[in-house]
Amino acid sequence: PIYKGNHPAAKSVLLFPRKAVHAGTVANVQKFLKLGDSLLDRHILFDVIPDDLNTAEALANYKAVYRVDGIAPAASSRFKITAPKTVRASLSRPAKGDKLHLHFVNYNRTEPAKPKSAGGGIHDEKPIAAERVQFVFTIPEGKFLKSVRFFTPERDKPLELLPRILDTNGQRVEISVLEFLVYAVVELEFE
């Protein structure tokens, strides 16, 4: 139920330069990839939409719009993620319930002995656990954080996480993510 019917939920968007690609300017794709990597390295949560579909209505829900040929805007301050560079993050909203799912993927592993080799498959994967992952989150106005749950394939059941309140009105919280190998989800449930 974590993935079924999920919708993008980031407050930043990166526009894919499809207009330029259709015009034969494929160099913009490299700029797009470089900008996307930069956002991922800084743990900025963002959605991706093609620039030929970026109507005012489509962009209305975003606080920051990143374009390959534009000045980089300030990132949304709703989430501030601290994690190793090997960890990537994304955000989604489930179809049911008032929740957000913060997904973490850890790419840190012991590399295969042979360069440019994937090894013999999944049984050769040697992930190195992600540690010291945390984030600061601003609770949307008019909402209360009901629960914070941590999911990972290494555990049979989700665990409750306790947020640390950072301000006097309780709207800004810090959440420390437990150690995980490859994948984890933190579910924020509101009331």
Pin down the residues of each PLM region.
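Carbohydrate-binding surfaces of carbohydrate-active enzymes
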Residues: 1-191
